[in-house]
Amino acid sequence: MTSWQRLCWHYRLWTLGCYMLLAILALKLSLRLKCDFDAMDLDSEEFQSQYCRDLLYKTLKLPAKSSINCSGVIRGEQKAVTQALLNNLEIKKKQQLFTEADYLRMTADCEHFKTKRKFIQVPLSKEEASFPIAYSMVVHEKIENFERLLRAVYTPQNVYCVHMDQKSSEPFKQAVRAIVSCFPNVFIASKLVSVVYASWSRVQADLNCMEDLLQSPVPWKYLLNTCGTDFPIKTNAEMVKALKLLKGQNSMESEVPPPHKKSRWKYHYEVTDTLHMTSKRKTPPPNNLTMFTGNAYMVASRDFIEHVFSNSKARQLIEWVKDTYSPDEHLWATLQRASWMPGSDPLHRKFDLSDMRAIARLTKWYDHEGDIENGAPYTSCSGIHQRAVCVYGSGDLHWILQNHHLLANKFDPKVDDNVLQCLEEYLRHKAIYGTEL
């Protein structure tokens, strides 16, 4: 073999070696970049890869309705907030929300609906998969609000009971049923009631869902209850961590009632289309219970919910409050201070928990808004007020996200869709990347 032939032979071997090395590197890279979305765990080494997270986020990123600076709105930058508020004024005139007919059409193909509407269809971590949450969702109108709320809290390991007001419109009920039918872990409450504002029926709607959820095969740990104007301000992963920290305790507003609220259970109330106070005085609470006041929303352990149905003293209190005014605002608060209820707090006033200290729901009340430097708990609402409660605007989002609550109330895309869009973007980005926008 001549020196030229030997040189050519060595060159071929070198080239072949280079190709083999490149092939091995390509194989290793492809294995590293393989993202198993069916057995996903964002805490695993595989999903520490920026490639996998980017791919997942691209798949689940929600389409923006408006070109606003959500990062700036979330940080509370005045220029971004002002632009979002002005943009909201412009789009409100021509805004078209999805109708019941739209949802009937979209859900004709469930897989397409879930993919197009960007529902998260796999648990994002092993920790979340092993800690399912139950939701009691009471709704009566505004179908897009319901679907966006469901999408925001939905994961396949959780379980969701939806109570529709029996007097809701037929198109609304059909659309809710159509949406629910697309998910194996979402169902309609087995018993529906007509809900009258501030009456017992609001509690009964939740109780119907609670009873159904206790029959579910899903081994949920905690229950959260929602209404149609709620929205989460924490990701599911953050909720799981917060619930684990409770270690079996509940978290809900429960305080000594001010004098003006005591009349709510001193007199018998009658229900027609609305609630009417009579002159008939009620007997004292059963079992010499001390009454407390709070709100309709709770973060309650499974043990607590089970005792609502099985404990005779709890059942007696439930019967007693049925003819009171807004029983949802004192039933749960009082049970939370009963020593025989799991996860409850002691009676002493030092254990009072305000709505700002509980994690169940963040709400801005009109009569508490003002200048923080002068002692107000929060600044003025940037949206509008409904029954003295702030319907949030874009200017509220920075404040909202500084708080420890799991959900906030009230949101309405008809009032300000941009605050919802930015909150949705924030939650989806944080769910995938673990960081803010």
Swiss-Prot record:
It catalyses: a 3-O-[beta-D-galactosyl-(1->3)-N-acetyl-alpha-D-galactosaminyl]-L-seryl-[protein] + UDP-N-acetyl-alpha-D-glucosamine = 3-O-{beta-D-galactosyl-(1->3)-[N-acetyl-beta-D-glucosaminyl-(1->6)]-N-acetyl-alpha-D-galactosaminyl}-L-seryl-[protein] + UDP + H(+); a 3-O-[beta-D-galactosyl-(1->3)-N-acetyl-alpha-D-galactosaminyl]-L-threonyl-[protein] + UDP-N-acetyl-alpha-D-glucosamine = a 3-O-{beta-D-galactosyl-(1->3)-[N-acetyl-beta-D-glucosaminyl-(1->6)]-N-acetyl-alpha-D-galactosaminyl}-L-threonyl-[protein] + UDP + H(+); a beta-D-Gal-(1->4)-beta-D-GlcNAc-(1->3)-beta-D-Gal-(1->4)-beta-D-GlcNAc derivative + UDP-N-acetyl-alpha-D-glucosamine = a beta-D-Gal-(1->4)-beta-D-GlcNAc-(1->3)-[beta-D-GlcNAc-(1->6)]-beta-D-Gal-(1->4)-N-acetyl-beta-D-glucosaminyl derivative + UDP + H(+); 3-O-[N-acetyl-beta-D-glucosaminyl-(1->3)-N-acetyl-alpha-D-galactosaminyl]-L-seryl-[protein] + UDP-N-acetyl-alpha-D-glucosamine = 3-O-[N-acetyl-beta-D-glucosaminyl-(1->3)-[N-acetyl-beta-D-glucosaminyl-(1->6)]-N-acetyl-alpha-D-galactosaminyl]-L-seryl-[protein] + UDP + H(+). The keyword Transmembrane helix applies. One of its GO terms (cellular component) is Golgi membrane. GO terms for molecular function: acetylgalactosaminyl-O-glycosyl-glycoprotein beta-1,6-N-acetylglucosaminyltransferase activity; acetylglucosaminyltransferase activity; beta-1,3-galactosyl-O-glycosyl-glycoprotein beta-1,6-N-acetylglucosaminyltransferase activity; N-acetyllactosaminide beta-1,6-N-acetylglucosaminyltransferase activity. It holds the Pfam family Branch. Glycosyltransferase that can synthesize all known mucin beta 6 N-acetylglucosaminides. Mediates core 2 and core 4 O-glycan branching, 2 important steps in mucin-type biosynthesis. Also has I-branching enzyme activity by converting linear into branched poly-N-acetyllactosaminoglycans, leading to introduce the blood group I antigen during embryonic development. Residues 1-12 are cytoplasmic. Glycans are attached at N288. It is a single-pass type II membrane protein. InterPro entries: Glyco_trans_14. It is an enzyme of class 2 (transferase). Residues 31-437 are lumenal. Its EC number is 2.4.1.102, 2.4.1.148, 2.4.1.150. Its main location: Golgi. This is Beta-1,3-galactosyl-O-glycosyl-glycoprotein beta-1,6-N-acetylglucosaminyltransferase 3. The keyword Signal does not apply. Belongs to the glycosyltransferase 14 family. The chain crosses the membrane at residues 13-30. One of its GO terms (biological process) is protein O-linked glycosylation. Pathway: Protein modification; protein glycosylation.
